[in-house]
């Protein structure tokens, strides 16, 4: 086991503060509409230029292990805020630094760190309650666009495209962000349910130009097993042929004689069909087949429920207005399922999301909700260079998460004003003793810090602006983008309540831990023994053996 160095008291805390300050100072320059860029070195290729706080935080690793511990603790604030709210990472970092800086002065003055921490917690609880009162629902497309714009560093185009995407697929819909091929941002919306399985044979293709099999008003057969024998399928094929409609078969697999017969019938025009594999694997496949059944008003033909292919009837089949099957995707548009049944299924999946333990499961369940409830929107980010593309894509993702958070918990005035408006409520909070009251004072000072930093990044005088905003009420604040004072909500300067709340809670949590730290343990750097190197060097003399 490697030797360790242990530091106590002030020696430990001073190293932590240095680390906190290095990371926070690098991150906070990006705050606000006039925040500066940070250039990040890459081991290969061009450097990355970003205004995204969490991207800057993730890059920072300090040489001194004790200082690095402080930096990593604040990095945790940024990451946690990004994970829960999708944005607000820079605000959280600024708040954490402010609480730690102010708190350390009180600790140095001999106050009890545990009481300071309790005071900080009381103040934050009061601020969070006040934020909830200030919050108003984010319902209109205009407000969604404004939230997106602010989060994307005042890029109105990004806000507009996110609002349009949410408009098209609903607030529950899946929105994915990927690299575009042009200079402009594009929005591609997939209506209905899409899953990542394509046709099993190219002979099913009906449009050579688009390379898709398009079925109008088809029946949809859902089966959870492999279909190889055509005799199992014949009874239902005959019923579908009599009805004069096309047929989509979704099964674990279709091969051999069954696939060959379907292809021949399709080519001859006797019965228009298409076969695709069921999406997902194992239990997820069964669940997704059930989703498709509910969406299309059909039943999954499975032995578990006492149904077999030979005895299947037309009533067991689902229906849709249109189905498009490509090489890699199948899209079911306007399924004939009962609306109430679909809503019940969505509610059931949402309960599973609440109980899900892994992020992967949660994400997959969220996708299933979106496919049933809304649709899928694809934002293709356009840019002139790869460097710009990466930076823009990160901003679009930030903006998307922020708008989701706004829809979830509502919006408050932006520009650091919401935190400033909680000061009255926080100042009424009372601690159990003098040290806890000092903890409340620490938070009161920290609540001003995001606005101060936004103003500083604009090149204006922070104290003047903070005092003027404090004199106003409600949504009155400073619009850093234009340099004007006024109603920030009317100006479109909005923050999601969830983002502001998460930033404050995460910052105070980690800052409280730092203030109550009294010892630190880190590995001593390994020293290379000079003997080994010298011995190896001596082997060079063996060259002289050749006489």
UniProtKB/Swiss-Prot annotation:
It is found in: Cytoplasm. It is an enzyme of class 5 (isomerase). ATP binds at residues 30-33, 51, 87-91, 415, 479-481, 495. Pfam families: Cpn60_TCP1. Keywords: ATP-binding, Chaperone, Cytoplasm, Isomerase, Nucleotide-binding. Residues 532-547 have a biased composition (Gly residues). Together with its co-chaperonin GroES, plays an essential role in assisting protein folding. The GroEL-GroES system forms a nano-cage that allows encapsulation of the non-native substrate proteins and provides a physical environment optimized to promote and accelerate protein folding. Belongs to the chaperonin (HSP60) family. This is Chaperonin GroEL. It comes from Nitrosomonas eutropha (strain DSM 101675 / C91 / Nm57). The lineage of its organism: Bacteria, Pseudomonadati, Pseudomonadota, Betaproteobacteria, Nitrosomonadales. The gene is groEL.
């Amino acid at each position: 086991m490697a030797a360790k160095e242990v530091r106590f008291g002030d020696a430990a805390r001073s190293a932590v503060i240095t680390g906190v300050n290095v990371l926070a100072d690098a991150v906070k320059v990006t705050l606000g509409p006039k925040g500066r860029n940070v250039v990040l070195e890459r081991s290969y290729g061009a450097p990355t230029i970003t205004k995204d706080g969490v991207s800057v935080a993730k890059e920072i690793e300090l040489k001194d292990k004790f200082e690095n511990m402080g930096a990593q603790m604040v990095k945790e604030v940024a990451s946690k805020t990004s994970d829960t709210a999708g944005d607000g990472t820079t605000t959280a970092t600024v708040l954490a630094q402010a609480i730690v800086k102010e708190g350390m002065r009180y600790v140095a003055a001999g106050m009890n760190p545990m009481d300071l921490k309790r005071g900080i917690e009381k103040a934050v609880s009061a601020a969070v309650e006040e934020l909830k009162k200030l919050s108003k629902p984010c319902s209109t497309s205009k407000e969604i666009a404004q939230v997106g714009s602010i989060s994307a560093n005042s890029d109105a185009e990004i806000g507009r495209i996110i609002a349009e995407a949410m408009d098209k697929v609903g607030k529950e819909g899946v929105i994915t962000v990927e690299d575009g091929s042009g200079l402009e941002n594009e929005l591609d919306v997939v209506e209905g349910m899409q899953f990542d399985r394509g046709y099993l044979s190219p002979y099913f293709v009906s449009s050579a130009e688009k390379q898709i099999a398009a079925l109008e008003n088809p029946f949809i057969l859902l089966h959870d097993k492999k279909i190889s024998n055509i005799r199992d399928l014949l009874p239902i094929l005959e019923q579908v042929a009599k009805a004069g409609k096309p047929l989509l078969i979704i099964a674990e697999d279709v091969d051999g004689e069954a696939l060959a017969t379907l292809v021949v019938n399709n080519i001859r025009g006797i019965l228009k069909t298409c076969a695709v594999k069921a999406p997902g694997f194992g239990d997820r496949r069964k669940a997704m087949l059930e989703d498709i059944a509910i969406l299309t008003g059909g039943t999954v033909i499975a032995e578990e429920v006492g149904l077999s292919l030979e005895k299947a009837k037309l009533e067991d089949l689902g229906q849709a207005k249109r189905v498009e099957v490509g090489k890699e995707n199948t899209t079911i548009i306007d399924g004939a399922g009962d609306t109430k049944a679909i809503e019940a299924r969505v509610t059931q999946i949402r309960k599973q999301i609440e109980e899900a333990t892994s992020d992967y499961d949660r994400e997959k369940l969220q996708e299933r909700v979106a496919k049933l409830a809304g649709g899928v929107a694809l934002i293709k980010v356009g840019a002139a260079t790869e460097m710009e593309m990466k930076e823009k894509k990160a901003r679009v993702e930030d903006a998307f998460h922020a708008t989701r958070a706004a829809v979830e918990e509502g919006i408050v005035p932006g520009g650091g004003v919401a935190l400033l408006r909680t000061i009255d409520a926080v100042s009424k909070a009372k601690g159990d003793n003098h040290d806890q009251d000092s903890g409340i004072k620490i938070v009161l000072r920290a609540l001003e810090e995001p606005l101060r930093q936004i103003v500083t990044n604009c090149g204006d005088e922070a104290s003047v602006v903070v005092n003027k905003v404090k004199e106003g009420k409600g949504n009155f604040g400073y619009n850093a983008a234009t340099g004007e004072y006024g109603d920030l909500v009317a100006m479109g300067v909005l923050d999601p309540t969830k983002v502001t709340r998460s930033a404050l809670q995460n910052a105070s949590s980690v800052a409280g831990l730092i203030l109550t730290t009294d010892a630190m343990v880190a590995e001593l750097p390994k020293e290379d023994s000079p003997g080994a190197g010298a011995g190896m060097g001596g082997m060079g003399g063996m060259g002289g053996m050749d006489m």
